Amino acid sequence: MASGSEAEKSPEVVLEWPKKDKKRLLHAVYRVGDLDRTIKCYTECFGMKLLRKRDVPEEKYTNAFLGFGPEDTNFALELTYNYGVDKYDIGAGFGHFAIATEDVYKLAEKIKSSCCCKITREPGPVKGGSTVIAFAQDPDGYMFELIQRGPTPEPLCQVMLRVGDLDRSIKFYEKALGMKLLRKKDVPDYKYTIAMLGYADEDKTTVIELTYNYGVTEYTKGNAYAQVAIGTEDVYKSAEAVELVTKELGGKILRQPGPLPGLNTKIASFLDPDGWKVVLVDNADFLKELQ
């Protein structure tokens, strides 16, 4: 991937970049069977805003971006509808998204009374703790954890994925992507461990929640959830760091860094050691897309 002087960089120099880069979680991408139904559900039940929508007839798909704030500052959900496909397999590996709210009971009642989503876990304290949570399921089967919290600039607060080796995954996200381990919690009574990773405090930004279930090393991925996009100041340097870490911990570069045809947005993509896809997007190019 690198050439000339770049090829001579020591691993230490390459791995310094993720520590000083200004990365940000941009959006999660997944597929839905009825785009208008999902937009209606998320806006009416969860209180999200439809941020933008684009139809690409030559490639037979439509995208919609939803969230609680503008994409230049907030995380978004990118929904993809592929013409004629009304059902997907979510698989066992994807866990949930999470929404922070000041009143879980009130939000759950709103969902019950006027929504195509359904409450699958009634509001109440989390097992073994005091945080009030509930779970809702959207029409495609995606789960949303509702978490009671004070006011936050980012209500869309988690993407939860299951992994087969938590320590390996933590090391990968720290070294390759410069994330911070914000919290780690073992729950032996229920045989799982979680780790929260991100670029700022949990109550201020979106984080990746990685879950390890005791003894489970592999999960089915299905074809519904696609990827998370992360903004970076330099796609080339970021991809170089990722490629180096994949040699140590596993994973795979899928797309070498470079501009997308037509858009000219510079991206790179890769799989983490568990096969979860991540796309790196140039921060400046992403902001141009939003104009």
From Swiss-Prot:
One GO CC annotation: cytoplasm
Catalytic reaction(s) noted: (R)-S-lactoylglutathione = methylglyoxal + glutathione
Modified how: Phosphorylated after gibberellin treatment.
Biological process (GO), any one: response to oxidative stress
Active site residues per record: H96, E145 (proton donor/acceptor), Q158, E209
Record-linked InterPro entries: Glyas_Bleomycin-R_OHBP_Dase, Glyas_Fos-R_dOase_dom, Glyoxalase_1, Glyoxalase_1_CS, VOC
Disulfide pairings: none
Field pH dependence: Optimum pH is 7.2.
Its biological purpose: Catalyzes the conversion of hemimercaptal, formed from methylglyoxal and glutathione, to S-lactoylglutathione. Involved in the detoxifiation of methylglyoxal. Can functionally complement growth defect of a yeast mutant lacking GLY I. Involved in abiotic stress response. Over-expression of GLYI-11 in tobacco increases tolerance to osmotic, oxidative and salt stresses.
NCBIfam families per UniProt: glyox_I
Subunit structure, as described in the record: Monomer.
Identification of the protein by name: Lactoylglutathione lyase
Taxonomic source organism: Oryza sativa subsp. japonica
Gene: GLYI-11
